[in-house]
């Protein structure tokens, strides 16, 4: 069960241990898709968005159909698991989605997707240049706070714990009654 979220990191056991010791989970913030983290770490002036998706597929980080990863469904499923373990009632339909690929890219064939996805490259490159100038990175973040859940692409600066997340790593921050000022962080593959 532990391997369902965070690539086998001790996230679920940690949440259970905190709760059983009398603590309460107040907020969960996490990067839970190694595939999406890989993609957003690879985008550069030389490697456009569409190419990073292809690279993730070639290196077997992504599903054979990368639209599954890009849809955020896997991250939503993982967030729901964590929320339930933390004592919250949550269904996948309750999670607010802020996706970065238009809905119409998810319909049609995989071949259709590969033909359309390069049309996103210019917009991603324009924004990437701004982020680079502002010393920020993209991260696809799952969040649970005050019983509300969301997933979406966020821009994080160098002061954020997610900024230096490399490769296909996962990271989770647990804010609890005990770890309020300095959230507990679990990071790795």
Which sequence ranges carry the predicted segments?
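Rossmann-like NAD(P)H-binding beta-loop-alpha module
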Residues: 2-59, 73-74, 81
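Intrinsically disordered, low-complexity boundary segments flanking structured domains
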Residues: 14-18, 126-127, 159-162, 172-173
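Catalytic, metal-anchored helix/loop core of enzyme active sites in primary metabolism
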Residues: 29, 37, 55, 140-189
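Substrate-binding/catalytic subdomain of NAD(P)-dependent oxidoreductase enzymes
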Residues: 42-43, 51-164
